Regions:
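Short phosphate-coordinating micro-motif centered on Lys-Gly-acidic
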Residues: 142
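Cytoplasmic juxtamembrane regions at transmembrane-helix boundaries
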Residues: 101-117, 248, 439-449
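Transmembrane helix-loop-helix hairpins at membrane boundaries of multipass inner-membrane proteins
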Residues: 1-7, 15, 19-116, 195, ...
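Hydrophobic transmembrane alpha-helices and their helix-loop junctions in integral membrane proteins
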Residues: 98-104, 123-135, 148-428
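Hydrophobic alpha-helical membrane-insertion segments
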Residues: 39-53, 171-180, 381, 417, ...
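Alpha-helical transmembrane segments and their helix-start/interface "positive-inside/aromatic belt" motifs
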Residues: 30-42, 162-172, 368-372, 448-456
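Cytoplasmic/organellar membrane-interface segments at the starts of transmembrane helices
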Residues: 368-370, 423-493
Length: 493
């Protein structure tokens, strides 16, 4: 029997969390909790790298499949990965240890409980990207809400309870219809096995309603306009590590869901509703970019920029073009790196000055130069400068959209200009200009842990900007197979 590497990736964070739950530091400094959680997350990252190295990129089918009977005659615990899902697993295992390192500076109370929540959340997120059964996917997908709800509600800002419940209710209500749809799929097809559903298809007459049910969940979690209003509040109140996990990983689960399920299971309905997705996506890109230009809170500005970036993602997915879908996946990976870095950059200055207002800063370039340089890099990556990972995804998406719908592509291109406007405006006001506050002179530059975390994010941001082949080679065959399956199902219908 082959080693269950995917189950190990899912279970290892849970084991680490249980160890933390049942042990205590005698001196109360939580050193054991810090080292155990970091060791657990680091080992998980190394396992995911081994998974990537041993993954056969020439095969389009799922690999490392584990299939075990769970509920007799109904549900199997079935997990596996293809070229699409493996990148999201690596992103998850890469971001998690960086979040754990960052909490030393940001979490002052109940640190052990916070680390337990992060590890549990990592387990659920990996499960989402591995799941090959609809019920298993749904359980992981919804379970991820619980630790994030606690992270915002316990360790968040003054309005944390309101923001936590808003986040929880929005995302939970959006998923009720998806649960009904999964039960309906089992009633229609007699299975919730994703691979079997790919092979046999779902009757065309049911697809529209089922697609809308899945859309109700994915649109809220992406989030797409107009379902995005929970996100700025959640980001503003969440602690820095919570914002990083929310932006870098949690939003990507919905984008992944659109690719894996909306396109894979409901091709006829996806063709019908593509104009809807295009419309909502371009509104998200342009409208939320304009809102970002009006923000005075740094976290809110970055939150609205996330909605705009995810608008590009949904646009690219529904082009059903090789470049469009590949661009969307790369954009999600890049956004995971860059948005994590931007929220960490906000966290750095907030820890020192206890303000997120842009007007509280200015002229800090000579005071904290290392911070200013790294902040500039991530600002340029967020606006899609060539040579950064942000450029590759946006460029491929726009190539795919131009092939499919010229007018939509032209409107979406405005988002590139607006993105440059709000990101450069943010950077100019925070870093350059006159020193508006004498207290800023007391700021100290990045400490060792902050410099390490931001450097870890800067390296792949630059590397994949100049050399995206490792990402493209990993996803190319799986994306091509998905498009062929999509087109064949349309022809057969």
């Amino acid at each position: 029997m082959n080693f269950p590497i995917l189950s190990s990736l899912i279970l290892l964070p849970v084991i680490g969390a249980l160890f933390l739950f049942f042990t205590k530091d005698k001196d109360g400094n939580n050193l054991t909790a810090k080292y155990v959680s970091l060791f657990t997350a680091a080992v998980n990252f190394l396992i995911s790298i081994y998974l990537w190295i041993t993954f056969d990129q020439s095969i389009s089918s799922f690999q490392f499949i584990e299939d075990r009977e769970w509920i007799d005659g109904f549900i199997n615990y079935k997990v596996g990965v293809d070229g699409i899902s493996i990148l999201f697993i690596i992103l998850t295992t890469f971001i998690t240890p960086l979040c754990i390192i960052s909490v030393n500076n940001t979490v002052k109370t109940r640190l052990r409980d916070f680390l337990i929540a992060i590890l549990i959340m990592e387990s659920f997120m990996i499960g989402v990207f591995c799941a090959l059964d609809l019920v298993v996917f749904y359980l992981f997908f919804e379970a991820g809400l619980i630790p994030m709800f606690l992270i915002i509600g316990i360790w968040g800002g003054p309005k944390r309870v309101y923001s936590a419940f808003k986040f929880f209710l929005y995302t939970l209500l959006g998923s009720v219809l998806m649960l009904v749809a999964i039960i309906s799929i089992y009633w229609i097809s007699g299975t919730t096995d994703v691979i079997k559903l790919y092979e046999f298809g779902i009757d065309e007459k049911y697809q529209n309603l089922l697609w809308l049910a899945f859309f109700s969940s994915f649109a809220v979690k992406t989030p797409m306009w107009p379902f995005h209003t929970w996100l700025p509040d959640a980001h503003v109140e969440a602690p820095t590590a919570g914002s990083v996990l929310l932006a870098a990983i949690l939003l990507k689960m919905a984008g992944y869901g659109f690719i894996r399920f909306s396109l894979g299971l409901f091709p006829v309905a996806s063709e019908v509703f593509t104009p809807l997705i295009y419309g909502l996506s371009v509104i998200a890109i342009v409208f939320t970019s304009l809102i970002a230009l009006m923000q005075e809170d740094m976290k809110k500005l970055i939150a609205y920029s996330s909605v705009a970036h995810m608008g590009f993602v949904t646009l690219g997915i529904f082009t059903i073009q090789q470049q469009g879908i590949e661009g969307s996946i790369i954009q999600m990976i890049s956004h995971g790196l860059v948005s994590a870095a931007l929220f960490l950059c906000v966290g750095v200055v907030y820890d020192r000055m206890h303000s997120r207002l842009i007007s509280s800063y200015g002229g800090i370039v000579t005071i904290i130069p290392k911070y200013s340089i790294l902040f500039m890099l991530f600002t340029l990556a967020a606006l899609g400068l060539p040579g950064t990972s942000g450029f590759i995804g946006e460029f491929l998406i726009l190539m795919g959209v131009f092939k499919d719908n010229f007018l939509v592509a032209v409107i979406a291109s405005l988002g590139v200009i607006l993105g440059a406007a709000y990101m450069l405006w943010l950077y100019k006001r925070v870093v350059f200009g006159k020193l508006v506050n004498k207290d800023l002179t007391k700021m100290v530059d990045l400490n060792k842990s902050e410099y390490f975390i931001l450097s870890c994010l800067a390296i792949p941001t630059l590397f994949f900007g100049f050399y995206p082949d490792p990402l493209i080679n990993t996803i190319e065959v799986s994306v091509s197979d998905l498009i062929n399956m999509y087109n064949n199902n349309l022809i057969n219908k």
